[in-house]
Amino acid sequence: MRHILVTFAMCFLAISAYPGTYVETFDDGDFGDLDIYNYGGGISEWKVEDGILICRRPVSMTSTLLYGEENWGNYSIECDARIVEPIANLYSIGLDLRVSNIDNASSINDVWCLAGNQGVVYIWAWLNGNSAVQSPQKAFHLQLNRWYHLKAIANENEFEFYIDGELMASLSDSRFPSGRVGLAVTGSVSHLDNVVITGDDVPDNNVETAVSSSGKLATTWGQLRRQ
């Protein structure tokens, strides 16, 4: 986990402001017993080194590390992410919303929020294993080795994707009422850190795990000291 320059008081208020807030900083060297879904098959490698989650996905299809349950409704997810090394022709980082039916590729549903080397940011929804709808695209030049703060929101039929606090894409669709949530990597070696998930269905984890003895905040609120 990288340092975040805020006070303990700000940390506590930010985390306790929601009835359900899950924080993951990877400081324990593990990402737990989570499902990994590789869209289109192929391989991916997810591991934790030095308090940072690392994904290696060598093909131009997305690999997603999934949190939560399929009955999760409204929530937000945010994290810090950067692409360190492109591997495939198409590469991206992003977040995955309302993911369901991963046991059957022909019936999987999800809403991707992606930024990559295509020069645009967009939300792309898939229904029953097929492309269903895509948001208007917004121009965006993704820089390698630069940390970005990603945030995605699923609220009723509305989906929003933010990068560094700026709304980059939005989509309205009623066909994705609930589902799991995840971190998405395509065609690259990418780093991810400081995951925060909030929502009515999201279980709290211990606030004390979000703050080290030195008072460093382990979520993405506050000003990051970019490396």
What are these regions (language model features)?
Residues 6-16:
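Bacterial N-terminal signal peptides
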Residues 1-5:
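Positively charged n-region of N-terminal signal peptides that target proteins for export
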